[in-house]
Amino acid sequence: MRYPVDVYTGKIQAYPEGKPSAIAKIQVDGELMLTELGLEGDEQAEKKVHGGPDRALCHYPREHYLYWAREFPEQAELFVAPAFGENLSTDGLTESNVYMGDIFRWGEALIQVSQPRSPCYKLNYHFDISDIAQLMQNTGKVGWLYSVIAPGKVSADAPLELVSRVSDVTVQEAAAIAWHMPFDDDQYHRLLSAAGLSKSWTRTMQKRRLSGKIEDFSRRLWGK
């Protein structure tokens, strides 16, 4: 199955309280180089929590925009791609039918699903909606991130094509394990066994198993 894709990149900008972000992106056409760190011309702020080899690309399903426009009718005009800061936008791929570790061919490159996107408080400023990061997490409409396992030239003219599936954990299930379920060591083990899981999510699940408790999400979701 092949999925046509729209492609977006962005530059770092200042947001309220002086926090930088590259969430504002623009559509790009033509050929780009995709490296292990992401798309040519795309920037990430605060690289401790954004970007890097495990989180080189962000994918957000176009299907979700109608949901958000209905939830916030007064701001409906905001909810068009790439409003959530995604690099890739498609129809037909969602958290329910994409699996952890899925490998897609994109042009000359190969990319692998590494984790659900962990929404952060900068989205609240970006949309001027105080709790949209929390709402994304609650609904599971978060999208997902990729690592780049084979760099190469890519473009919006090259569709995504699934070439390998080795996991039984969907992105939707991974998000539920991480954020919605009570402490469950067996589910953490299941998630840790999923191919390609990012280092940051691996550390988080390992810490939970060692500590016996779930970490606080408030700093990521609210910035405090």
UniProtKB/Swiss-Prot annotation:
InterPro entries: Benzoxazolinone_Detox_Enz, MoCF_Sase_C, Pyrv_Knase-like_insert_dom_sf, YiiM-like_3-alpha_domain. GO terms for molecular function: molybdenum ion binding; oxidoreductase activity; oxidoreductase activity, acting on other nitrogenous compounds as donors; protein homodimerization activity; pyridoxal phosphate binding. Residues 26-163 form the MOSC domain. One of its GO terms (cellular component) is cytosol. One of its GO terms (biological process) is toxin catabolic process. Coiled coil: none annotated. It comes from the Bacteria. Monomer. PANTHER family: PROTEIN YIIM. This is Protein YiiM. It comes from Escherichia coli (strain K12). The lineage of its organism: Bacteria, Pseudomonadati, Pseudomonadota, Gammaproteobacteria, Enterobacterales. The gene is yiiM.
